[in-house]
Amino acid sequence: MLEKFVEEHKEETIELVKRLTSIPAPSHHEDEKAAFVLEWLKKQGADSAFIDEVKNVQFAYGCTEDKDMVVYMAHLDVVFPDTEPFVVNEKDGKLFAPGIKDDNADLANMLMCIKYLLTYKPELSVGLLFVANSCEEGLGNLKGSKKIYDMYKGRIREMISFDGNLDRIVNKAVGSLRYRVTVKTEGGHSYNAFGNKNAIYELSRIICDLYQVKLPTKAKTTYNVGHIEGGTSVNTIAESASMLYEFRSEDKYCLRIMEVAFENIIEKYLREDLDIKVEVLGARPCGSGVDEEELQALTQKHVEIIQKFTDREVCINSGSTDANTFLSHGIPSVVIGTVIGGGTHTRAEWIEKDTLVPGQKIGLASVLSYVCGEK
């Protein structure tokens, strides 16, 4: 029945992917796409679906107070700031458009899983909460997934996110801290005020020190200055300069080591009477307290599901995803993909159209693993 449903709804899925992809949805501005998803769900019979205060679209299936809950998520937002509709182009069996792989194709497959449940109404051993969530990308800071945890904490047994390629599973959380650092000085005319402190130079000193920090070795840890700006003109001593800085790790203790190193460097320059402003732009948690046997069981279940419908070798690794929120609270969580594509976060992003079929079978098999009596 599963495979028959997917094959029969192949064209509907493709059209849904195209429609979702066409709707712009920068982080924090998912309103239009959320409204479309809610309307689509209502048309399928999901009368209880609703949009919450942070723009998540939620639909609970079989959720009662006496049952544990498993959360399924696929995110609404994309990295692109556009507010005009995107155009989906097709060539050589591929669909091209910004955001089509991350995460519109996976979102479409999750919605089709809901359609299956509403069509056949199977009895479940757990409640399933489906969430088309907001703010997964960048400085969205996992606002959508954090809201779901806060609303249902104590009831969530597992979490599965549809996000990425179908031959990849993420089961470890890469945490991060992101900052904007702004340095201000008196500046002045490059000739007449020569000798005054230059904000660009002072900021560059801070950057050089940050790049000399000795990395912890307990887990992979990285850092990056990804953007700098400042100054006025070639003949002006810069009075303001700023940078965006982040560090990442799979381990919370490594993150703390990097945080302390950052704070110490800033303090060093504050003692030189520099005017420095530090803003925390984002914080994503690492995993903490997850039962390894339960996580391995959830991971292995999905490895077997993927291998049932594809001949691809499954890669298991870490990432910064909606699963971070749940892994940080000890909830076994995995991220699986339901499509093959590439060019993620570029305007040449693409998916292989035919992989939506095995991808949807993978997603649906995951969902149906919670049906009473199913294996």
Features from the language model and the residues they span:
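Buried hydrophobic packing segments
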Residues: 37, 107-117, 148, 203-207, ...
